[in-house]
Amino acid sequence: MDLVNLCSKLKKGTVYLKDDYEDIVLRMEIIDNSTHCFIKRRGRKEVEVDSKEKDVFESKMDGNEISKEEYDEFR
């Protein structure tokens, strides 16, 4: 997803992405004017990660938007 589109969607609410290459899903939201990023890997619990990390940035760029339901069902 391109950065302009991602930023626009984040201003409206939580954004969910799936990166098929890394086999992870991301949940991003703005809390107190700061972007918080959470990832979930198969078989693991959701964890908060630094949204500026290189791998997270690549997943944001390469990921496809998914629904909250798809995010919740990812295991």
Predicted regions and their residues:
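Short linear motifs centered on Gly/Pro in flexible linkers and helix caps
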Residues: 15-19, 28, 68
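Mixed-charge, Lys/Arg-enriched low-complexity segments
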Residues: 54-75
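Acidic, low-complexity, intrinsically disordered interaction modules
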Residues: 21, 25-61
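Arginine residue identity/basic-tract feature
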Residues: 6, 10-11, 27, 41-44, ...
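Negatively charged, low-complexity tracts enriched in Asp/Glu with abundant Ser/Thr
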Residues: 1-18
